[in-house]
Each structure stands twice: as C-alpha cells, then as structure tokens.
C-alpha cells in the first residue's frame, strides 16, 4: 500500500517520468526485506500536498535546458492568449507580466527604404534579443537601430511589460526618443521622456500609464529606490554610453537594485569605446551583468561595405622657441620637488621629464593606500605637499606643450593667487622668473604654432570644398583654447562662420552653454548657419552632430577612447579626413603610446572577448517552446510630434464640491444643460477680422488703454493700403488720433440722444492720408481731394474742449464763456484753387447759423449765442468779411452734404465791441496797467500794429484738434486779420483771450467722457496763425512733417531776468523804436558781451532782485548766463508764453507756479513803494499768462514809450477787453535771453533812480499819489540809463530793508479797508484796485 500512493499520485500528472518510476518499482521488488522502508523513504515526499515542488526539481541527469527557465503550473490561466511567465521560485516577487504566444512566434526586423539591411546589425540584434549584450560599435554604425528593434520586439512580446531606455543627458534622451520612433514607429501614446525636469508625483503617474520610457540614469535610480518605478513589470533595459558604467555611477546602482529583485530582465548596453584597458572593460561587464560582447570596427569584413574612407593625418607641430624656453624654466621648478620625493622613498618609475599629471596622481594614490614603511608620520605632510606641487606643475607643462603659452600662463597666475600651491611657491624664485618669462613672451605676441597650422588647414580645406555645404569640427580639450581658436577664426574672412559648443558648467574665464543653447547651435549648424564648430569633449559622444568633412584635433594628448569618438564624427556617408595636431616632444610621444595601447585592446575584444573577459549568465526571457522566427516588415511610421513642456491632455481638473453631492440623475441633467468651459475654450483670433481691429469700439466712462491704442496703430500700419478714409475718420472722431496717443486731452462728448443736438448734426472730418503741397508763396496752401469730403454715418462730436468745460463732483457740467466754434467750412489760401468736382460749393450755405450751447446743469444755464455770418460774394475777387463774436462756442453744426464736400473745419472769429464793454479788469491787473512796469517776456514774431496779415489754416483731422491748436496760439486785442483768396477775402476781428485751463472731473452716469485727439506728429504744413511777418523766426513756425513738442512738458525753472535785458533787446532788434525814444540823452556806454564780463550800466541804479543771492557783487557771470542777442529761443525764457500750440493742456492749469509764489513773497517784503509791489504782484504765471502785447501810451510830456502788457486769459474777460483798448498796438519782437536769466522788474524804459536809504518814508507816503499818476510817473524814468546792479546792491543794508518792509506792511493792514473801496480810474474804461484784502496775511505767499 505504501507504494500505491505515490503511483496513484503520479498518474494524476500527465507529464510523469515513467522510466524513473519503473526503476523504482524494480528496486522495490528486488529488496523485499526492506521494501516498505525503502519505498516509503523514497516516495514520502511525493505524497505531500505540494507535489509540483518535486516535479519541478527532478534529478539533474533528467533535466533539459528548457527546465532551467520554465516552471510547470498546476492550472492553466483563463486567458489563452497570454501565458503567465513564472520564474524559478513561486513567490510574491515573481514577474507580473505575461507573454503573448502569438507574438512570440516571430520577431520583427524593419526593412524600410531609409533603413537598409546590414548584416552586422542583423546579427547583433538577433543575439541581443535572447541574452544580455554589450554592443561596441564605432560612432555612426547604427547602434540606435539595434536598440530600437530589440525594444519593439519586447514591446510586442510582453503586452503589459515596460521598457526603459537610459541616456546620460537630457539632449540625448530627446534625441533617442525621436530616433527610435522613426525606425520602428513605437506609438507615441505609449512613450514618454522622464528627466529631472519632471516632478516626482507626475513621474509616479506616468510609470503606471506608459510603457516605453526614455530616462536619465539619475532619475531611474531615484525612482527605483523610492518605489515609484514598477520594477516587477520591467522586461527590457537599454543603456546608452555604457562605458560610463564604472564605480558608483547611476548605471551601476540601477542594475544592482534590479538584480536584487528576482525578476527576469533583458539588458542591452551600447557604446562606441568600451575602454582603453582590459580592467575597465571587465568592470563594465560585471556591473551590467553582460553575457555577450559584440564588437565591430571599420576593418571587419561585414562593416567595410558601409564605412567610407577615413584618412587620418598626424601633423607634428614644432613647439616654438618661446614655449621651449618656458618649458625648460618649468623643469627647473619641477626638479627639486621630484628629488625630494625620491629621497622620501617614493618611486615614480619613470624619467621626471616624461611624467604626466595622471601618472603623478596614480603615484599619490598608491602612497596613500600603502605609506612607505619606515617613513615617519610627520613627513607625510611634506610628501603630500610635494605631490600637490608636482601635479600642478606637470599640468601647466602639459598645457604649455598642447595649447601654448597663454593657457599655461593663465593657469599659473590663477594658482598663485590663493591655495596651497600659492603658499608653497610664494618664495620660490624659479617660479617667479618663469612667470616673468611668460609675460615677456606674451607681450610680444607669442603666436601659437598650432593656431597658425590650424588656420592653414582650414583655408586649404575651404578652397577645395564649398563653404556653404562643407562642415568642420575642431576639438579642444581645454576651454581656454576654444576662446583662442575663436579669436583666430574671426580673422580668416567670411568663408568661415564659426561658433563654440561647450558644456553647461561656467568657468572663471568662459561661461557655459545651457542645453537650449546647445540644441540651437546644433540646429543652426545642420541648417548651414555655421560651417565650423569649436567643441570641447561634449561634442565627442552622444549628440548627433551630422556628417562632417573634416575633424581637427587641436590637442592629441587624449585617451584612445576619446580619439575614437572624435574620429567617428566623419567618414559616415562620405569620405572623411581627421587631422591631429601634435606638438613635438611629449605630446606626440604620448599620442603614439596611447594609440598602441588602443590597438592592443582591440585584439582582446576579438571573437567576443571570450578569451579575455568573464561573462555572466542571463535568462532567455522567451521560453524554449517558442522559437521566434524573423519577419522583415516595412513599417508605415507616422510623423513624430515632439511633446511640449506642458501636456494639456493630462491636465487634471478637480471636480467641484457641489457635484460630489449630486445624484447621477442630477449630474446628467447638469451636464446636459451646462457646457464645461474647460472643454470648449474661446480662442480669440487677432487676424480673423482685421478691418474691425483698426477702429476702437465705443466706450462709456472707461477709456481704451494705451496698449489697445498701440495694437490699433499696428493694425492700421499693416493695412495701410486698404485702410479707408472713412474708417480713419471714424477712428479720429471716436476716440483718439491716428498718430501717437501718449498724451491725450480729455473733453466732453455728446451722447447719441437726439435731444442733445437739436439743430446740430455730427460731421465727420476725414484727415488721414491728406497731403499738403508746398508752394513758393509765403503762405502755404492746402490741397484736398474729393475723397476727403465724403460724408459718413453720424458719430459722436466733441462740442467743447477740456479748457472750456469742467465737471464737479455732483456731475454738473460747467461750460466756460469763451469756447471756440468751428464750422464745417474751410478757408482756402489765395494760391490754392478750389477742387473742381461736382461737390464744389461756396460758403454761402452757412450765412446764418444758430448755435446751441450744451448745458447739462439746471443751475448753470447759458444763453444761446447767435453768430451771424455776413457774406458777400463777388466774382471779380471782391472780399468777403466775416464778423464773429468774441465769445464763441465750439459746436457741431447742421450742414448739408454740399457743405461737407468743401469743408474740413472752419474757424469763425467775430468781434463786437458791445460785447466787451462790460468786461472788468481785476484790481491787480488794473494796477498792473497803470504802473506800466511788467516783467519782460518773449512774444511771437509780430509785425507792426494794424498791419494786414495773411492768415493760414492748417489741415486738421477734427475740430477738436484744431481748437487745441488755436488755443495755443496768441491773439491780439482789436486786431483785424484779412485772409486773401482767389474768390473771396475774409477780414475778421478777434479779441480772443487766453483763459487758464481747468481740470475736467469725472462725469455722472448720463455723460460720456472722450479724449480729444491731439497727435504728436503732423504731416501738413502749418503756418503761424498769428503772424506771417517776414522777420519771423523759423523757430516759431511748424514746418511740414515737423514733430511738435510733447504735451506735458517738464517744468522749466529759470533764473530771474536781469534789469536792462529787455531794453537792450529792444534797442538792438528795433533801432527804429530806439530812435523814436528821443528822451534818451545818451546811448549805452558798454554793450553786453559774451564771455565772463559783467553787464555794466552807466549811472542808473538797477532795481534788481537776485534769486537767493546766487550772484554777488564780486562774482562773475558764467558763460551760460551771457545774453544771446541774436537768438529767438523764447522757449528758454523764464516766463512761458504758451508759444507751443500743442503744449496747452489741462495739467498746466493745475500746476502751482512756485516761481510766481517766490516772486510775490520776495517782493512783499521789499522796501519798495507800494506801486512797485503791486506791479510785481501783477506778474503772471508762465502757465496762465497769455501772449505779450505792447501798448503805445500818450504821455502828457509828449513822450512815447513802450510798456509791456501781458493779457491773461481769465473769466473776467470784460475788464481784460477794456484794458486792451487803451491804445494802438505796436508789436515788438523781443529776443530770448540765456537759460540762466535773472528776472528783473523792468519795462522797455529805464527804471527811476530811488535812494532807498533816505526816501523809504517819502515813497511810502507818495504811494497813493504815484498810483494815481500811473504811466506818467514811469515816463520820467526814460531819461536815465541802466547802471551796474551789482555795485548798487553792494551798498544796500538788507536788515534795514527788512525792518522797513515790516513797517510798510503794518501800515498797509490799517489802510486795507479804505483802499478796498477806493477806486481811481486814470483813463476811461479802466478800474483800479490795489488788491489788498481786509484780512491779508503779513507774508504774501503769492497764491491768487
């Protein structure tokens, strides 16, 4: 019975070994005595439940090769398509992947047209599929194809398996993923690249979702150690640049980690040079568990058909006398330290003249591992210091022999700065002399023989080869030489386009290149942007640097491994040439020695290295029951799509919290009626509707940004040929000009409500692409086309500029009483014929127009002002006279289409004396006029009074633009301007007054704010609207195409004007006025001269106030204070006359005139009579002052003098009108002074002589009387001349002046109330007030 149990159990197994069982039965029958014991002892294990355990381990003599790799299972898997693969041991760490039996019957080899079938590649691939293989092939012989085919077949065989391709750098990873795709077409949805730039959490997700991974060894090592990498699913590992697998490099750590897990893994290692020594190659085999070595070189019979001729040339370059001298000097430094080492017992085993830095390093390591016996421990430090000095010195000597004197000198200088070498050599005389010798040689140039030879080789090469198609690589092991080579190549000429290709690490002398820059350099090199690359060791391996025709090795003292890598860059598709530059002596000898050792290594690797190396067993991975047969397949490969930095398809969206609480039915309903914005993202196209992007959209309150304006300008510039006039006019009227928008003037814009425009219709003025023609006549003409007058749909119209309207905090709109009105007619200059079109009409259609002012406030309503246009037309050239009111408003008018045809924007200027009778002058201005003393200020170039002038109007794009221009121009009281035309003459009298501009506040919700278009650049000829006198300077005329001043000009603070400057300017520029001034008895003694001389007056005491006492009586004037008597640079004067048309903005009204504050406060403390203080207080701000005019006053003594009058533009326009009707105008042009001009209270006449020491009281008492006399008191001063102001102030007692000023101010407070009611009118139409208030402060701050 004991024997039946195992027999019955064995019968249950279909694969029972019957022969073994029969022998056992026979033995049991023969030994009947102990049959029970013998049978039970042998068959007892078979009766145990785990029967398959014994069956999987039968006696060794009965086993076949198949039993080593395949384990029997008791139950077959349910999936008949994939058979589970079990290892030798059944445990939890067994592989979790199964093999596809159908796919395992074949293995695929590509036969695409771009991938020719090569015998050596096919043979190596067949071997690598079934064993761990080290493939050693020279560069360019197709190692990547072998790896791609192996990866693809394992991808087919194991549907759940994962394949890893490891490369030492990120560029190589990206390069290999594309190469493998182009060879076998592994689907991209299964491939991914994992580098250090991928976060660990994302890598964990990718390890589960992908199957083919291209990684760096460092990332693979970290993921395996952290458990992120699913090692149980790995079936194939490809290692590129396998010669790095030494020591504890990541390749070695990864393989050790994987071998610790009981898995079956296929390893394929690729390299061009496994090593230069047998020990190194054996180390690679051990670290990577290699079973087979596949080695090929260019001389093998199966490789020769695919390798082109590669010519190797070794050129011996003489070291040079200079380098030889330095080498001998260095040897004198080396000898003492080598002798000391020998005395200590260290054996260097070679002549010290032929030693290399590497050999010294090996000797030091040997000494550290086994110190010399008998050597005292205290001497170990001396031995180490000698080794350190020799290593540095031999390295300097190597640089000297390989690269020249300059790299050697730079290294020596760096080492002598700090560190142990510097401390050891600080007192060494030989090293100091060596450094001095290097400096001397470098000062004389010290050309490197290698550089000269290299340039010669390059020039000869490009004479034979086409520089556009030929490529050259120059290898240098030292970065310093890369710089020298680049400098030398820059002197060859245009045929050489060189660039450097170096590593990422930045040194002290040369900055490294990032991987992005490296890829860009290689791409440009392939495209032909460069034809020469100067590379360090980074260009030797790995990267695909296309086929080159010539390889130049600038240094020959490199290992055979690296030399093979360099040589592999040429001779792939065409014949190649390799030139090695070796200096005579040590460098050439070292090169020859290393080449000999390389040839010996090749012999060891012959026939797979079976006689020289020990290999490791590896699993077959494919069971023996499957015998895969090759199947040549032509792949249809899709185009490779590089993956971006961010995978949008992997964007993880978090489910909203409310959806987690919904039922499935509610979620379905929500998805039915709600579109997820993440699914369909709106992508606004910037080129879909280009026409609409040339115009801004309508806005309310919130204006378009500056960036929007820039975009619109760019779109208009791109569509210039197709950009219509109508579109441009729409753009101009709606938001901003077609030009620059850096500074914009804010104004009001009328809404679209028809009730706001009862009798006014929007008129669109087209200005884009208008061209002005320059003619020879003094007045420029305007040329318009029919297209310019096309009428478009109504748009918004600017009714008022910012200077005419303001908005308070409650939203009430206040319109100033002096806006400007523009009609849709244009004035043609006399030399311009009217356009002969069908739409040509005269101006008679607008003979009478009612103007409706805009009023949005119930409390501030204004009466409608009616302007009558009186028009006379005569065919023979009779003149038409247009009389307009002085108070006009800017508005849009209802005109017919016929009027639009000939209109650009007409200015209607009216004059009515009745309207100006009620004007009142301010008390300060009254005193200002009476005294006749005003600060000197430049004016426009003006002719004589009452002269006829030709008035020109510029081409403007909109009334708003023209209004700002006109507001910037000066105007004159009671001035008639006659404009001559071919068909009509227009004579207009204008009394336009400048008014300080007000800041426009925010409007209420019912109003729209717009921006007044004021372009910075005009391309139309502009004439001076106030004067076209022939004596006018060009500085005051804006020529065609001339860029105007920017709107917000920086404030210019000038020094005060000196007394006498005005009078000297009048005398020199207007000799006629000087002659008419017969009161002057003598001329000036000395003229104002450039240089360092002071301006000297004769006898008169100058009333002068020095700004903060900068110029004393003994100080000299600087060169920039000299008076420029010939210049008209009025923009540099202290007082701004608003001469620039475009410089009048709202910001000017908001500025505080600190110089006016200073001037008033200073004069309020001076001991001058009250009339001078009042006059000084009447001086105006450079930001609010209007144009300067001259008034000829009739004197009682029949004297005539000129006194300056600044007419400020204030709301009190009636008083200003009366003030300006004093007499006839005489326009005087005053030249501008220098930039540092001091201000002085002076008029065109001389100041009176005042004895300030003795007559303060007398003048104080006579203040009121002198104020009554007004201009007469000033006339008597004309008989005096100017005197030296510095000498005058040298005699003043300022303390007494301050005391007297305090006394005078106290008297003024007591008399303030009486003076406030007293009004003295010296001339009809003028009023007088001293301007002192009841509660005036003791110190006048100058704020009004």
UniProtKB/Swiss-Prot annotation:
* Alphabetically ordered keywords of this record: ATP-binding, DNA damage, DNA recombination, DNA repair, DNA-binding, Helicase, Hydrolase, Nucleotide-binding, Nucleus
Localization in the cell:
Nucleus
Q: Where is the composition biased (Polar residues)?
A: 1207-1218
Its UniProt entry gives the catalysed reaction(s) as: ATP + H2O = ADP + phosphate + H(+)
Listed GO cellular component terms? nucleus
In the record, biological process GO terms are: DNA recombination; DNA repair
Name any one GO molecular function.
3'-5' DNA helicase activity
Protein name per the record: DEAD-box ATP-dependent RNA helicase FANCM
Q: Which organism is it from?
A: Arabidopsis thaliana (Mouse-ear cress)
State which gene encodes it: FANCM
